[in-house]
C-alpha cells in the first residue's frame, strides 16, 4: 500500500528582496507582476523552507519518497542541508527517495529559479513563466516492492490498446522496483472485473 501526506502548509519563503515570509502552497512570487501581460515580471532565484516530522514507516519493508508535482522552472532540493536532487522543467513531476536521510525532525529547502536559461523549454511564449512551487508537495511511503517512482516522474505504467469490433487487445507494461509478480485487472463502468492478467518481472 502507498500512503501520501501533503506538505502544503507552514513554508517560509525568502523572496528577491531577502525578506522571509510565511506562505502556503501553491505559491508563486509573480502573482502580481505577472498579471499585466508584459515581459517585465521579476525572474530569478528564491528559496522555500519547511520542517516536517519523519512519517511512521518500517525501514525493513518500506521506503519514503518526496514528490513535487510542479516547480517552475529549475529546482535544487536539500534535505537537512544535504543536496537531494535537482530538476529542470516547470511542468513535470519529479521525486527523490529520502529513506536513508530522514531524521526525527527534518528541514526541507527548495531553491527555485525561473530565470531565463538554455535548459528549460519553452524559451519564449505568450504567457508568464511564473516562479514558485505551484503544485502539491507530498511525502510518499511505499513498500520496497512497488511500481517505480523514479522514472522521470511518470506513473510507471504504460497501457496500449488495439480496439476491434466487439473486442480489445490491451497491453500493460509496468516498471517495478523489487521482486514479485504484477497483477493487472480491468473493470467495467459498474466496477465488475472483466479481465485479469499476471506477469513476472523481466529485468
What are these regions (language model features)?
Residues 23, 86-87, 196-197:
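Short capping micro-motif at the N-terminus of alpha-helices
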Residues 158-168:
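Short, solvent-exposed loop/linker segments at the N-terminal edge
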Residues 2-40:
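N-terminal structural segment of carbohydrate-active enzymes
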Residues 62-64, 166-172:
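Structural beta-strand segments of beta-rich domains
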Residues 20-23, 147, 157-159:
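Short clusters of hydrophobic/aromatic residues that line enzyme substrate/ligand-binding pockets
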Residues 193-203:
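Intrinsically disordered, low-complexity Pro/Gly/Ser/Thr-rich segments with frequent PxxP/GP/PP motifs
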Residues 3-6, 11-16, 43-150, 154, ...:
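Accessory beta-strand-rich segments of carbohydrate-active enzymes
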Residues 172-173, 185:
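Beta-strand-rich structural segments
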